[in-house]
């Protein structure tokens, strides 16, 4: 049993714990959570979730721990990652989900505390490697890669269909837009923020802002370095987002051939990572979907032989958290 610690018990940290419990109950175990809020608050927010409803299992508090279905998870509250006693808790892999410690040097503090590996749940800088499950996860090498970024939820949505299309037809260049649900890095009401657009009320505006998802493609699909760019539109929905990208192909194709290539990729190479949806659905229909990317077939088409538009849905909280759990499991299998 590989032992996990979670640093930062916010939206992603809590969903990662649920994903581990649901997907890997016999191979992964979360044994400690480090968060500055008290154990009672964290247990309450874990059990009662506005987006996903009440947790079906048993959640109780016991001194400095909370018990989930009888399993004790130590509650820690250290502000400095270097002070967290991961070694005392026997933690093998730390899930760094605060959104604060997103560089290699910052995340390496967890290694100093006794952990063997760190997975950053965000785009990172100076990390050992960025991995997207289904795309480049096989590049992981246990002796070389200790600080691993799971990229962003948007990169995890964008990369699978891009990989399938690039392998089939070759991509010359592309532009993407993610229509993204609001997150905690926005303001509920107008309030100062270093990004003046994110300073505006999240529930009342469509907010254009940056995304590193397109540029991060080059980290997981090196062939596309410098060939993709894009931006984000934050919208007043609580979860589930959608990527819309246009790309110029190197070879000609048809709408039906493009759709079939994506269907085949979802059934074979990217099974469980990418799916194709034939129905006429809307965002809330994908809430709780564990796929990284769900291609909307009706809105995926070709213009004049070599310009393609692809639309793909993703639950930016749950789908991404499932990939974090998958990555931890994969790393454990390949060696720490």
Predicted feature residues:
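N-terminal Rossmann-like NAD(P) cofactor-binding subdomain of oxidoreductases
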Residues: 1-199, 302, 326, 333-335
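Active-site-lining helix/loop region of Rossmann-like oxidoreductase modules
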Residues: 3, 7, 11-16, 25-26, ...
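Short capping/connector residues at structural and topological boundaries
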Residues: 50-51, 64, 71, 89, ...
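Short clusters of hydrophobic/aromatic residues that line enzyme substrate/ligand-binding pockets
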Residues: 66, 131-133, 147, 189, ...
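Structured loop/turn residues at secondary-structure junctions
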Residues: 98-99, 153, 209, 250, ...
């Amino acid at each position: 049993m590989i032992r996990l610690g979670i640093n930062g018990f916010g939206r992603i940290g809590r969903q990662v714990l649920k994903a581990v419990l649901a997907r890997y109950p016999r191979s992964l175990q979360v044994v400690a959570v480090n968060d500055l809020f008290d154990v009672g608050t964290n247990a309450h927010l874990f059990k009662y979730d506005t987006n996903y409803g009440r947790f079906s299992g048993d959640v109780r508090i016991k001194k400095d721990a909370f018990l989930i279905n009888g399993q004790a998870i130590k509650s820690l509250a250290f502000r400095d990652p270097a002070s967290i006693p991961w070694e005392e808790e026997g933690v093998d892999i730390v899930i760094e989900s605060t959104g604060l410690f997103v560089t290699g040097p910052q995340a390496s503090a967890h290694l100093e505390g006794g952990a063997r590996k760190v997975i950053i749940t965000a785009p990172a800088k100076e990390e050992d490697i960025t991995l997207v499950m289904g795309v480049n996860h096989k590049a992981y090498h246990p002796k070389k890669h200790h600080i691993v970024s799971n990229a962003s939820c948007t990169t995890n949505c964008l990369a699978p269909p891009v990989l399938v299309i690039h392998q089939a037809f070759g991509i010359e260049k592309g532009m993407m837009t993610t229509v993204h649900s609001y997150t905690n890095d926005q303001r509920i009401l107008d309030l100062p923020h270093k990004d003046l657009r994110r300073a505006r009320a999240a529930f009342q505006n469509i907010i254009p802002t940056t995304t590193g998802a397109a540029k991060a493609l080059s980290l997981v699909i090196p062939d596309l370095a410098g060939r993709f760019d894009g931006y984000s539109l934050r919208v007043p929905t609580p979860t589930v987002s959608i990527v819309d990208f246009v790309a110029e192909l190197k070879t000609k194709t048809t709408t039906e051939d493009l759709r079939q290539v994506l269907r085949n990729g979802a059934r074979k190479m990217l099974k469980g990572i990418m799916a194709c949806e034939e129905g006429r659905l809307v965002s809330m229909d994908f809430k709780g979907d564990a796929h990284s990317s769900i291609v909307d077939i009706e809105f995926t088409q070709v213009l004049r032989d070599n310009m393609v538009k692809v639309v793909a849905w993703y639950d930016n909280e749950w789908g991404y958290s499932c990939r974090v759990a998958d990555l931890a499991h994969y790393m454990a299998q390949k060696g720490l």
